[in-house]
């Protein structure tokens, strides 16, 4: 039997479960209100003021820094823009915005980093595959970077005040629409001079293309030697002269310090036989002794001295033409119009007695080029080469009464003995350049002093052998350098003599000056002693030295 009314009571477990459910609902609501209030009031006015002080303390400068930020032109949605920018601001404060420790700016950055860590719970994370979407590289000043950071915090505060859950929006679709291509707004560097590739053909370079100063070697030097002269402040003419064989080194354009580059004119040399097949050009050192008879027969009788009046050498030749003698058998003298860059090829035309004569032994044989004359089976061009001292091509017109050898006759080839006695011959006509006509006329006064003196009134003998000039294989550039005489010293020897002579002169002057100063001091000391010598005698002795010697006791 049960107690009365016991059947209408509820078990205690039922009331306990409902009570726990009510408590859970109240707790969840309070937690939600706390989270919303926490995100809405996360960013205070003090954080924005510290950012403004950070901006005001920066120095205005034109120096730009590189950083990655959101491209607002691609991402139009403001919520997605701030959601992407918030993650990038964290990286910027950690990597770019750095200050010295324990300074007000460094403390402000630490506070902002702590704020961004607390705000991270208010943002939902999107897919990682869109991390670089809508992001590009910016090149701006530090002030502009700080302005962007301040705007991000300010806009985030305004949106969180309106809706604390606004950044839970899914922005994957907006990020997918953006192109992840990184657009660079400015180039990394401004290259002033494009690098020129060294080429053996200067004409292939454009006239308007500037040369890089470090890539253009000095003319006449090898490529390894030109690299050693890059850091030197000497002009091309002041560099040590290096002789280079034209067959072993390619022709390279000279060093240019200007913006424009003019390709040098390459002299045209026709080297062929009657059949038209080109023959290999013999080297300078390899000279066949069997050619002595051929050269002697070709040059000994057909080339006669020029008239002694000197009228033929004074014929003015325009600068735009070059004299090109035709085949000896042709019997004609041709004047060909040349390009503006060509120069005068010869100082005087062929004499009239040389026309119509043809060598008998060299009709079908191509001869090697010796000196300034190279007879061949075909027509050939004559281009003189600049030497260290003026040769017969650049001499002044002789005085009346003194005959002169023709300018086109090879020097020292009148007899076979002189042919073997002169081993050093001209290397190549195409390896050097020719002085302009105006420069030749302007240097006549200096040529007279440098050229070897000739006997006054003595006629030049036709068979007399003149010493061959020492040719310089290194062509001079357009800087107008002085030519050296035959007996002059090399630049290294002159420099060493100068360095030895100046100290020796200074030492001699110092020695002479010291000797004079010593003599002057000695005289100045002797004069007071002579003046004080009468006073040094004792006052009580009226006798002189002679009297003392007389009165000595015996």
From Swiss-Prot:
Pfam families: CSF-1. This is Macrophage colony-stimulating factor 1. Homodimer or heterodimer; disulfide-linked. Likely to exist in multiple forms: homodimer consisting of 2 identical 150-200 kDa proteoglycan subunits, heterodimer consisting of a 150-200 kDa proteoglycan subunit and a truncated 43 kDa subunit, and homodimer consisting of 2 identical 43 kDa subunits. Interacts with CSF1R. Residues 344-354 have a biased composition (Low complexity). Gene3D superfamilies: 1.20.1250.10. Its main location: membrane. It is a single-pass type I membrane protein. It comes from Homo sapiens. Coiled coil: none annotated. Residues 406-426 are annotated as: O-glycosylated at one site. The chain crosses the membrane at residues 497-517. It is found in: Cell membrane. One of its GO terms (cellular component) is perinuclear region of cytoplasm. Cytokine that plays an essential role in the regulation of survival, proliferation and differentiation of hematopoietic precursor cells, especially mononuclear phagocytes, such as macrophages and monocytes. Promotes the release of pro-inflammatory chemokines, and thereby plays an important role in innate immunity and in inflammatory processes. Plays an important role in the regulation of osteoclast proliferation and differentiation, the regulation of bone resorption, and is required for normal bone development. Required for normal male and female fertility. GO terms for molecular function: cytokine activity; growth factor activity; identical protein binding; macrophage colony-stimulating factor receptor binding; protein homodimerization activity.
